[in-house]
């Protein structure tokens, strides 16, 4: 949901960290330890989901001097917002999560994957496709051919192995 339904996500993360820095700092995060930082990381005011508020202000304070602590707080906050989104979807009648298949740059970040699992309480695995638009493509497929799309998607993910 981060970067898709929500205005939080990779773009916010990439504003503060280069890919090499992100990779190096992520290895120094203990994903089993919760960060005390409570951010709502937005690039500009306004959120769509899970909070529908066009005036919601970004919250990226306090900002620790230690870049590892800052990244840890950012990844924790993105994961918390993602969990809030899935919880809200379930309140509206969506099927409860059993696993999350993830794509895009964040799928390669082991620390973030572990943090997401802690918040979502389900396995988070990399999808067979690495492109960030993969989830959107799956939704489009289901909207176009709803009866055959589940088998197609399942086969794509199984063939990855």
Identify the function of each model-found stretch.
Residues 1-100, 108-160:
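Active-site core segments that coordinate phosphate-bearing ligands/cofactors
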